[in-house]
Amino acid sequence: AFMSLNGIDVSYDKKKQILKGLNLEVEEGELVSLLGPSGCGKSTTLRVVAGFIDPQGGTFTLDGEDMTKVPVHKRQFGLVFQSYALFPHLSVYDNVAFGLRTRKMDKDVIDKKVREILEVCGLTELADRFPKQMSGGQRQRVALARALVIEPKLLLLDEPLSNLDAKLRLSMRVEIKRLQKRLGITTLFVTHDQEECFSISDKVAVMNGGVIEQFDTPENIYRRPATEFVARFIGFENFLELAKKQDGVYTAPDGSEFLTSMDLDCEKFAGTIRPDDICLADDVQAENVLSGKIGVRTFLGKSYQYEVETSAGVLKVNMGTDHVYKEGEEIRLYLPKDKLILVRR
Protein backbone atom coordinates (compact mmCIF):
# COMPACT_ATOMS: atom_id res chain seq x y z
CA ALA A 1 0.00 0.00 0.00
CA PHE A 2 1.09 3.60 -0.59
CA MET A 3 0.48 4.56 3.05
CA SER A 4 0.29 2.12 5.92
CA LEU A 5 -0.07 2.24 9.68
CA ASN A 6 0.97 -1.01 11.37
CA GLY A 7 0.17 -1.80 15.00
CA ILE A 8 0.05 1.84 16.14
CA ASP A 9 -0.23 2.22 19.95
CA VAL A 10 -0.82 5.58 21.62
CA SER A 11 -1.53 6.15 25.30
CA TYR A 12 -1.53 9.50 27.11
CA ASP A 13 -0.77 7.96 30.48
CA LYS A 14 -0.42 4.42 31.72
CA LYS A 15 -4.17 3.91 32.07
CA LYS A 16 -5.68 5.60 29.01
CA GLN A 17 -4.86 3.88 25.75
CA ILE A 18 -6.11 5.95 22.81
CA LEU A 19 -5.03 3.74 19.89
CA LYS A 20 -4.74 -0.02 20.29
CA GLY A 21 -2.59 -1.74 17.66
CA LEU A 22 -4.24 0.23 14.85
CA ASN A 23 -3.73 -0.98 11.26
CA LEU A 24 -4.71 0.99 8.16
CA GLU A 25 -3.69 0.78 4.50
CA VAL A 26 -4.37 3.50 1.94
CA GLU A 27 -3.70 3.19 -1.79
CA GLU A 28 -2.22 6.02 -3.84
CA GLY A 29 -4.77 8.62 -4.94
CA GLU A 30 -7.48 7.38 -2.55
CA LEU A 31 -9.53 9.56 -0.24
CA VAL A 32 -9.98 7.63 3.00
CA SER A 33 -12.16 8.92 5.84
CA LEU A 34 -11.81 8.15 9.53
CA LEU A 35 -15.35 8.17 10.92
CA GLY A 36 -16.48 7.74 14.49
CA PRO A 37 -17.89 9.39 17.63
CA SER A 38 -15.91 11.84 19.77
CA GLY A 39 -13.00 10.21 21.56
CA CYS A 40 -12.73 7.19 19.23
CA GLY A 41 -9.15 8.09 18.24
CA LYS A 42 -9.68 9.45 14.73
CA SER A 43 -7.93 12.81 15.29
CA THR A 44 -5.15 11.06 17.21
CA THR A 45 -4.59 8.79 14.19
CA LEU A 46 -4.32 11.85 11.95
CA ARG A 47 -1.86 13.48 14.37
CA VAL A 48 0.32 10.38 14.35
CA VAL A 49 0.44 10.57 10.55
CA ALA A 50 1.17 14.33 10.67
CA GLY A 51 3.98 13.77 13.17
CA PHE A 52 2.48 15.71 16.10
CA ILE A 53 2.26 12.56 18.22
CA ASP A 54 4.95 9.89 18.61
CA PRO A 55 3.31 6.47 18.89
CA GLN A 56 4.55 4.16 21.68
CA GLY A 57 4.45 1.24 19.28
CA GLY A 58 4.01 0.44 15.60
CA THR A 59 5.25 1.94 12.34
CA PHE A 60 4.03 4.43 9.74
CA THR A 61 5.30 4.00 6.18
CA LEU A 62 4.64 6.14 3.12
CA ASP A 63 5.59 5.09 -0.39
CA GLY A 64 7.93 2.42 1.01
CA GLU A 65 9.71 4.82 3.39
CA ASP A 66 9.52 4.51 7.18
CA MET A 67 8.19 7.86 8.43
CA THR A 68 7.63 6.94 12.09
CA LYS A 69 10.49 9.06 13.43
CA VAL A 70 10.62 11.78 10.73
CA PRO A 71 9.97 15.25 12.27
CA VAL A 72 6.84 17.20 11.24
CA HIS A 73 8.55 19.81 9.04
CA LYS A 74 10.32 17.14 7.01
CA ARG A 75 7.16 15.18 6.24
CA GLN A 76 5.93 17.84 3.79
CA PHE A 77 2.27 16.95 4.15
CA GLY A 78 -0.63 19.31 3.43
CA LEU A 79 -2.72 20.02 6.53
CA VAL A 80 -6.13 21.66 6.86
CA PHE A 81 -7.67 22.16 10.31
CA GLN A 82 -11.14 22.95 11.53
CA SER A 83 -9.97 26.46 12.47
CA TYR A 84 -8.25 27.18 9.09
CA ALA A 85 -5.22 28.71 10.93
CA LEU A 86 -4.59 31.42 8.31
CA PHE A 87 -2.13 34.26 8.98
CA PRO A 88 -4.38 37.29 9.63
CA HIS A 89 -1.71 39.84 8.56
CA LEU A 90 -1.04 38.19 5.18
CA SER A 91 -3.13 38.46 2.01
CA VAL A 92 -4.62 35.38 0.36
CA TYR A 93 -1.73 35.33 -2.11
CA ASP A 94 0.89 35.52 0.67
CA ASN A 95 -0.90 32.93 2.82
CA VAL A 96 -0.83 30.48 -0.08
CA ALA A 97 2.76 31.34 -1.04
CA PHE A 98 4.04 30.93 2.53
CA GLY A 99 4.90 27.22 2.30
CA LEU A 100 6.76 27.69 -0.98
CA ARG A 101 8.77 30.65 0.37
CA THR A 102 9.93 28.66 3.38
CA ARG A 103 11.24 26.11 0.87
CA LYS A 104 13.35 28.91 -0.70
CA MET A 105 11.93 28.46 -4.18
CA ASP A 106 12.54 30.77 -7.12
CA LYS A 107 10.21 33.80 -7.13
CA ASP A 108 8.83 33.13 -10.63
CA VAL A 109 8.18 29.46 -9.81
CA ILE A 110 6.32 30.51 -6.64
CA ASP A 111 4.20 33.02 -8.57
CA LYS A 112 3.28 30.44 -11.22
CA LYS A 113 2.34 27.76 -8.66
CA VAL A 114 0.33 30.17 -6.48
CA ARG A 115 -1.63 31.58 -9.42
CA GLU A 116 -2.37 28.07 -10.70
CA ILE A 117 -3.73 26.83 -7.37
CA LEU A 118 -5.74 30.05 -6.80
CA GLU A 119 -7.34 29.43 -10.19
CA VAL A 120 -8.10 25.77 -9.35
CA CYS A 121 -9.64 26.77 -5.98
CA GLY A 122 -11.64 29.67 -7.47
CA LEU A 123 -9.72 32.32 -5.51
CA THR A 124 -8.10 34.39 -8.27
CA GLU A 125 -10.36 37.40 -7.60
CA LEU A 126 -9.58 37.32 -3.88
CA ALA A 127 -5.77 37.19 -4.12
CA ASP A 128 -5.26 40.62 -2.47
CA ARG A 129 -7.83 40.25 0.30
CA PHE A 130 -7.06 39.53 3.95
CA PRO A 131 -8.71 36.73 5.97
CA LYS A 132 -10.93 39.10 7.98
CA GLN A 133 -12.48 40.41 4.73
CA MET A 134 -13.65 36.93 3.74
CA SER A 135 -16.44 34.48 4.53
CA GLY A 136 -15.89 31.13 6.24
CA GLY A 137 -16.17 29.21 2.98
CA GLN A 138 -13.62 31.46 1.26
CA ARG A 139 -11.19 31.07 4.18
CA GLN A 140 -11.60 27.33 4.03
CA ARG A 141 -10.68 27.38 0.33
CA VAL A 142 -7.57 29.45 1.12
CA ALA A 143 -6.52 26.91 3.77
CA LEU A 144 -7.03 24.17 1.18
CA ALA A 145 -5.06 26.04 -1.50
CA ARG A 146 -2.21 26.60 0.95
CA ALA A 147 -2.10 22.88 1.73
CA LEU A 148 -2.23 21.85 -1.94
CA VAL A 149 0.27 24.33 -3.42
CA ILE A 150 3.28 22.50 -1.95
CA GLU A 151 2.18 19.41 -3.94
CA PRO A 152 2.16 17.21 -0.83
CA LYS A 153 2.42 13.43 -0.99
CA LEU A 154 -0.39 13.30 1.53
CA LEU A 155 -3.25 15.68 2.34
CA LEU A 156 -4.60 15.58 5.91
CA LEU A 157 -8.01 17.13 6.63
CA ASP A 158 -9.17 17.36 10.27
CA GLU A 159 -12.94 18.06 10.35
CA PRO A 160 -12.39 20.91 7.87
CA LEU A 161 -16.07 21.62 7.28
CA SER A 162 -17.49 21.61 10.81
CA ASN A 163 -17.37 25.42 11.18
CA LEU A 164 -19.43 26.05 8.03
CA ASP A 165 -23.20 26.32 7.70
CA ALA A 166 -25.13 23.40 6.19
CA LYS A 167 -25.48 24.77 2.65
CA LEU A 168 -21.82 25.73 2.40
CA ARG A 169 -20.74 22.35 3.75
CA LEU A 170 -22.50 20.68 0.84
CA SER A 171 -20.77 22.78 -1.82
CA MET A 172 -17.36 22.51 -0.09
CA ARG A 173 -17.78 18.74 0.04
CA VAL A 174 -18.18 18.63 -3.74
CA GLU A 175 -15.27 21.07 -4.09
CA ILE A 176 -12.87 18.95 -2.00
CA LYS A 177 -13.79 15.80 -3.91
CA ARG A 178 -13.30 17.57 -7.26
CA LEU A 179 -9.89 18.98 -6.27
CA GLN A 180 -8.71 15.72 -4.76
CA LYS A 181 -9.60 13.74 -7.89
CA ARG A 182 -8.21 16.36 -10.26
CA LEU A 183 -4.86 16.52 -8.44
CA GLY A 184 -4.80 12.80 -7.54
CA ILE A 185 -3.59 13.48 -4.00
CA THR A 186 -3.81 10.69 -1.42
CA THR A 187 -6.01 12.09 1.35
CA LEU A 188 -6.93 11.25 4.94
CA PHE A 189 -10.14 12.94 6.08
CA VAL A 190 -11.38 13.01 9.69
CA THR A 191 -15.10 13.53 10.36
CA HIS A 192 -17.94 12.50 12.67
CA ASP A 193 -20.54 13.32 10.01
CA GLN A 194 -21.70 10.14 8.30
CA GLU A 195 -23.32 11.80 5.28
CA GLU A 196 -20.27 13.98 4.62
CA CYS A 197 -18.01 10.99 4.91
CA PHE A 198 -20.04 8.72 2.61
CA SER A 199 -20.40 11.35 -0.10
CA ILE A 200 -16.69 12.15 -0.34
CA SER A 201 -14.75 8.95 0.39
CA ASP A 202 -13.38 6.07 -1.65
CA LYS A 203 -13.08 4.05 1.56
CA VAL A 204 -14.16 4.58 5.16
CA ALA A 205 -12.60 3.38 8.41
CA VAL A 206 -15.24 3.35 11.17
CA MET A 207 -13.45 3.74 14.50
CA ASN A 208 -14.50 2.89 18.04
CA GLY A 209 -12.37 2.95 21.18
CA GLY A 210 -9.03 3.18 19.40
CA VAL A 211 -9.55 0.38 16.88
CA ILE A 212 -11.03 0.20 13.39
CA GLU A 213 -14.32 -1.74 13.53
CA GLN A 214 -14.78 -1.85 9.75
CA PHE A 215 -12.77 -0.65 6.73
CA ASP A 216 -14.66 -0.76 3.44
CA THR A 217 -16.35 1.27 0.71
CA PRO A 218 -19.15 3.63 1.82
CA GLU A 219 -21.71 1.47 -0.05
CA ASN A 220 -20.66 -1.74 1.71
CA ILE A 221 -20.64 -0.12 5.14
CA TYR A 222 -24.09 1.37 4.54
CA ARG A 223 -25.59 -1.88 3.26
CA ARG A 224 -23.61 -4.43 5.26
CA PRO A 225 -22.28 -3.09 8.56
CA ALA A 226 -19.98 -5.68 10.15
CA THR A 227 -20.63 -5.03 13.84
CA GLU A 228 -23.45 -3.81 16.04
CA PHE A 229 -21.48 -0.64 16.82
CA VAL A 230 -21.09 0.24 13.12
CA ALA A 231 -24.77 -0.53 12.46
CA ARG A 232 -25.95 1.71 15.31
CA PHE A 233 -23.57 4.48 14.30
CA ILE A 234 -24.90 4.61 10.73
CA GLY A 235 -28.57 4.52 11.62
CA PHE A 236 -29.78 0.95 12.14
CA GLU A 237 -32.23 1.05 15.05
CA ASN A 238 -33.76 -2.42 15.26
CA PHE A 239 -31.77 -5.27 16.81
CA LEU A 240 -33.13 -8.80 17.21
CA GLU A 241 -31.67 -11.51 19.44
CA LEU A 242 -31.21 -14.41 17.02
CA ALA A 243 -29.85 -17.95 17.26
CA LYS A 244 -28.74 -19.98 14.24
CA LYS A 245 -30.94 -22.94 13.34
CA GLN A 246 -29.30 -23.78 10.00
CA ASP A 247 -27.68 -21.85 7.14
CA GLY A 248 -29.89 -18.89 6.29
CA VAL A 249 -32.44 -19.68 9.03
CA TYR A 250 -32.41 -18.01 12.45
CA THR A 251 -34.79 -18.05 15.40
CA ALA A 252 -35.77 -15.34 17.88
CA PRO A 253 -36.29 -16.14 21.60
CA ASP A 254 -40.08 -16.29 21.05
CA GLY A 255 -39.59 -19.07 18.47
CA SER A 256 -40.34 -17.00 15.36
CA GLU A 257 -38.10 -17.91 12.42
CA PHE A 258 -36.30 -15.53 10.09
CA LEU A 259 -34.65 -16.24 6.76
CA THR A 260 -31.56 -14.21 5.87
CA SER A 261 -29.54 -13.89 2.68
CA MET A 262 -26.26 -14.07 4.65
CA ASP A 263 -24.57 -16.13 7.36
CA LEU A 264 -22.09 -15.21 10.10
CA ASP A 265 -19.54 -17.46 11.76
CA CYS A 266 -19.18 -16.01 15.24
CA GLU A 267 -20.51 -16.69 18.72
CA LYS A 268 -22.41 -13.49 19.45
CA PHE A 269 -24.44 -11.76 16.79
CA ALA A 270 -27.70 -9.92 16.25
CA GLY A 271 -30.08 -9.37 13.37
CA THR A 272 -30.61 -5.75 12.39
CA ILE A 273 -32.85 -3.90 9.95
CA ARG A 274 -33.47 -0.20 9.22
CA PRO A 275 -36.87 1.33 10.10
CA ASP A 276 -37.25 2.21 6.37
CA ASP A 277 -36.78 -1.39 5.24
CA ILE A 278 -39.64 -2.98 7.21
CA CYS A 279 -42.86 -3.22 5.17
CA LEU A 280 -46.47 -4.04 5.87
CA ALA A 281 -47.08 -7.74 5.20
CA ASP A 282 -49.71 -8.68 2.63
CA ASP A 283 -51.47 -12.06 2.59
CA VAL A 284 -48.94 -13.69 0.26
CA GLN A 285 -45.85 -13.49 2.47
CA ALA A 286 -45.37 -16.40 4.81
CA GLU A 287 -41.82 -16.06 6.12
CA ASN A 288 -40.21 -13.18 8.06
CA VAL A 289 -43.62 -11.93 9.14
CA LEU A 290 -44.36 -10.67 12.66
CA SER A 291 -47.66 -9.60 14.18
CA GLY A 292 -47.49 -6.50 16.29
CA LYS A 293 -49.36 -3.75 18.06
CA ILE A 294 -48.82 -0.05 17.29
CA GLY A 295 -47.23 1.88 20.16
CA VAL A 296 -45.77 5.39 20.11
CA ARG A 297 -46.08 7.37 16.84
CA THR A 298 -43.60 10.12 15.89
CA PHE A 299 -43.99 12.52 12.95
CA LEU A 300 -40.77 12.78 10.88
CA GLY A 301 -41.97 15.03 8.03
CA LYS A 302 -41.92 12.65 5.08
CA SER A 303 -43.06 9.74 7.21
CA TYR A 304 -44.30 8.58 10.60
CA GLN A 305 -42.15 6.39 12.80
CA TYR A 306 -44.08 3.81 14.79
CA GLU A 307 -42.83 1.72 17.66
CA VAL A 308 -44.44 -1.65 17.08
CA GLU A 309 -44.61 -4.16 19.94
CA THR A 310 -43.99 -7.69 18.62
CA SER A 311 -43.26 -11.04 20.26
CA ALA A 312 -39.62 -10.66 19.12
CA GLY A 313 -39.26 -7.21 20.69
CA VAL A 314 -40.15 -3.59 19.91
CA LEU A 315 -39.39 -2.59 16.29
CA LYS A 316 -39.19 0.94 14.91
CA VAL A 317 -40.92 1.19 11.53
CA ASN A 318 -41.13 4.18 9.17
CA MET A 319 -44.31 4.43 7.09
CA GLY A 320 -45.82 6.97 4.70
CA THR A 321 -48.17 9.70 5.89
CA ASP A 322 -51.10 8.74 3.65
CA HIS A 323 -52.49 6.39 6.30
CA VAL A 324 -52.18 7.03 10.02
CA TYR A 325 -52.26 4.07 12.42
CA LYS A 326 -53.67 4.53 15.90
CA GLU A 327 -52.11 3.32 19.11
CA GLY A 328 -53.18 -0.24 19.92
CA GLU A 329 -53.97 -1.16 16.29
CA GLU A 330 -52.83 -4.63 15.21
CA ILE A 331 -50.62 -4.89 12.11
CA ARG A 332 -48.43 -7.48 10.39
CA LEU A 333 -44.85 -6.61 9.50
CA TYR A 334 -42.66 -8.13 6.81
CA LEU A 335 -38.85 -8.09 7.19
CA PRO A 336 -37.36 -8.73 3.69
CA LYS A 337 -34.56 -11.30 3.99
CA ASP A 338 -32.08 -9.28 1.92
CA LYS A 339 -32.57 -6.30 4.26
CA LEU A 340 -32.14 -8.30 7.46
CA ILE A 341 -28.41 -8.04 8.21
CA LEU A 342 -26.44 -10.13 10.70
CA VAL A 343 -23.83 -8.21 12.72
CA ARG A 344 -21.19 -9.23 15.27
CA ARG A 345 -21.92 -8.13 18.82
Feature map (PLM): residue ranges:
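The feature captures the beta-strand-to-loop junction immediately N-terminal to the Walker
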Residues: 35-37
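ABC ATPase nucleotide-binding domain
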Residues: 4, 25, 61, 332-334
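Helix-to-loop junction immediately C-terminal to a conserved catalytic motif
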Residues: 50
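Short coil-to-beta microelement around the adenine-binding A-loop and adjacent beta1/P-loop entry
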Residues: 15-17
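ABC ATPase nucleotide-binding domains
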Residues: 31, 72-78, 82-229
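Conserved ABC transporter NBD signature motif
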Residues: 58-66
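Glycine/charge-rich catalytic "coupling/switch" loops of P-loop NTPases
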Residues: 251-297, 322-345
